[in-house]
């Protein structure tokens, strides 16, 4: 055994340095928050509960192009388009999302040419039954109406990166 190794083992330098490292972290402020009462701000790119948006005049944005249905890797979206209207546009008759299948990848939101389907800021949508996780058009539109202000703000903040 050489003198260096003997000195290190007698002086317990590794133990002392580990102790001081632990003490440094022990006295730092903790990053934990008191969750239900305090919430961290979420990113504008956060992908939470789905919502269908409307135009400011109240008309729904979805034009039944079915791009979101085609791009969904989990095949969680089902759309039925209604007949063409006099002005040549279409609207959806049925717009269902199976949230059990959804993987929250955000591809539906990226594919939508009119920003109709978005993933909103809500992350607290736990349910007691599986059937409550099958979202129909009415529920998606209600989510959009409820979260429109936050969704519009997130889209505006994310605009430079789109």
From Swiss-Prot:
> Reaction catalysed by this chain?
a quinone + NADH + 5 H(+)(in) = a quinol + NAD(+) + 4 H(+)(out)
List the GO cellular component terms: plasma membrane
Query: What species is this protein from?
Result: Rhodopseudomonas palustris (strain HaA2)
Q: What is this protein called?
A: NADH-quinone oxidoreductase subunit I 2
Cofactor(s) annotated in UniProt: [4Fe-4S] cluster
Which keywords, in A-to-Z order, does the entry hold? Answer: 4Fe-4S, Cell inner membrane, Cell membrane, Iron, Iron-sulfur, Membrane, Metal-binding, NAD, Quinone, Repeat, Translocase, Ubiquinone
Instruction: Give the encoding gene's name.
Output: nuoI2
Instruction: Check the record and name the InterPro entries matching this protein.
Output: 4Fe4S_Fe-S-bd, 4Fe4S_Fe_S_CS, NADH_quinone_OxRdtase_chainI
Q: How does it sit in the membrane?
A: Peripheral membrane protein
Q: Which residues bind [4Fe-4S] cluster 2?
A: 72, 102, 105, 108
Query: How are cofactors bound according to the entry's free-text note?
Result: Binds 2 [4Fe-4S] clusters per subunit.
Family to which this protein belongs: Belongs to the complex I 23 kDa subunit family.
Give the organism's phylogenetic lineage: Bacteria, Pseudomonadati, Pseudomonadota, Alphaproteobacteria, Hyphomicrobiales
């Amino acid at each position: 055994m050489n003198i260096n190794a003997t000195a290190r083992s007698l002086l317990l330098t590794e133990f002392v340095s580990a102790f001081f490292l632990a003490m440094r972290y022990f006295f730092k402020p903790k990053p934990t928050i008191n969750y239900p009462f305090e919430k961290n701000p979420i990113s504008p790119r956060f992908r939470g509960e789905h919502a269908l948006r409307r135009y400011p005049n109240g008309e729904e944005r979805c034009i039944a192009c079915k791009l979101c249905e085609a791009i969904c890797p989990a095949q969680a979206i089902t759309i039925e388009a209604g007949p063409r209207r006099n002005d040549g546009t279409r609207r959806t008759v049925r717009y269902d999302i199976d949230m059990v299948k959804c993987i929250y990848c955000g591809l539906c939101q990226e594919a939508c040419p009119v920003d109709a389907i978005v993933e909103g800021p809500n992350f607290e949508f736990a349910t007691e039954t599986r059937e409550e996780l099958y979202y129909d058009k009415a529920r998606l539109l209600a989510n959009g109406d409820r979260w429109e202000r936050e969704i519009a703000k997130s889209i505006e903040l994310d605009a430079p990166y789109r």
